[in-house]
Amino acid sequence: MKGIFALCSLIFGLVLPPSAAAQDDARWRFDPYGRVELGFVSAESGDREEQIVVDGDAVTLRLQAGAELASDTTTFQLEADRIYVDRLGEGRSSYQRDRFTATLDQELDSDWEIRLQARRYDDFITAEANDTDETSGLVRFTYEPERAHRFRLSASWREREYDPSPEDGPDAFATTGRGPRVDAEYRHRLGRYHYFAADLRAESIASDDAFRRYSRQSGAVSYTRPLNHDLRVRPGVEAIHTRFGGRTGDDGEVRSDFRIAPEVELLWWPGQWRIEAEAKAIFIDSNDERRDRAGYRLTIAAGYVF
């Protein structure tokens, strides 16, 4: 963990020397912000989503507070998020998740930008565990030679700590994991809020606990089209292949899950309101019969930004 923050501090210093802040002092702008969002999730799937896993119905509340300090070419941002999940139904537990983020965006020239980010998650759900704490560092380069085309490449390193949960069994114990993630993204802008986007990702986690090890490759495409000034629709599809190195399928081989999830989103953003709805079908093909399933996930959320 200390190594990640030391690396980020070193890079921040190289990208933005103290003299830059002095030269731009007259143009710095400070902007605090916040967001409150209430949502409802209904799902028939054990599919894992970052921060939320629901097999049934749940009400969610998201609270976000942050502050941004920006000049013409540099932006610092600090942000804190908390999410409450109240799973409906007798005997179903509720929980909360926290996330803290520090970000620096720096324009290098008219075409290039770099992002440096440090992030801390407390008690969130990952592919390999139900109760994970994570500290991560990220470097992202953006190349936008013209407004119609944007390319991004990012690399991050994650350090994870796992607390055992009842689903892990009576012999489970606290363990750690670590590993890289690489993302490549392309977005083609066709007009205002009118985009085609494609994303590729490769990631892995290594751990002394074989049950926590996995590798994953994924790809996604989406198309965003405005229907009027405030309303747009976004169909898309995502495919994910995950191999769990310390788990065995019914065929005696390493457990391998392939998931494909077509979805459609509606986004209505009148003024400072953010009203969003998503319908997703989830199909998982696995050599572990317990994980071989199909399901759906429906989400609607109303948020206000200020």
Where are these regions (language model features)?
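Bacterial N-terminal signal peptides
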Residues: 6-15
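Gram-negative and organellar
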Residues: 22-306
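N-terminal signal peptide c-region/cleavage motif recognized by signal peptidases
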Residues: 17-19
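Positively charged n-region of N-terminal signal peptides that target proteins for export
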Residues: 1-4
